[in-house]
Amino acid sequence: MNITLSDADRELVREAERATANAHAPYSNFHVGAAARLRSGKILYGSNFESEVYPAGLCAERSLMFYAQANYADDPIETMAIASNPSERECYPCGQCRQVMVDVERRQGSPMRVLMSGHGTVTAVDSASKLLPFTFIL
C-alpha cells in the first residue's frame, strides 16, 4: 500500500537510493540498493553484484540480510528499504529475496517492514511474509 512515510522511513529510502551507487551491474545496468534499520537504530547497506558466472551474482536485499545475520544476528531488522537506478517504477524483491526475508523474520522472531521505492512513490508492507504468502517450509 502506498503510504505517507515518517522522517525515519524517508531517510531509510534515501539511504537505499544512495546504496545503488555501490552496485556492480555491468550486464543489466540495473543498480539496486537496500538499507535496513536494526532495532538498535544502526543502519546497514547492501547493493547488487553481478558476475560473469550469472548465477553467482547476488541481489542487494540478500547481500544486506546475509551480512546482518552474520554480524548482527541479535539485533533484528525492523525495516528494509529497497531502491533502484534507473528508477522507472517501484523496486520489488525477487522470489529468492522474498523467501530469505521470511526466513529472517522467522529467525529473529519479529516482522520486517519492507519499503519498496521508485519513481517518487513508496509501497510498504508491515511484514515480509505479505510479499510471499505461500512461503516454502522444509
Regions found by a protein language model. Give the residues of each.
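Short beta-strand scaffold segments in enzyme catalytic cores
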Residues: 31-38
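Glycine/charged-rich beta-loop-alpha catalytic/anionic-binding loops adjacent to active sites
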Residues: 40-51, 76-80
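Short, solvent-exposed cationic patches
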Residues: 60, 65-81
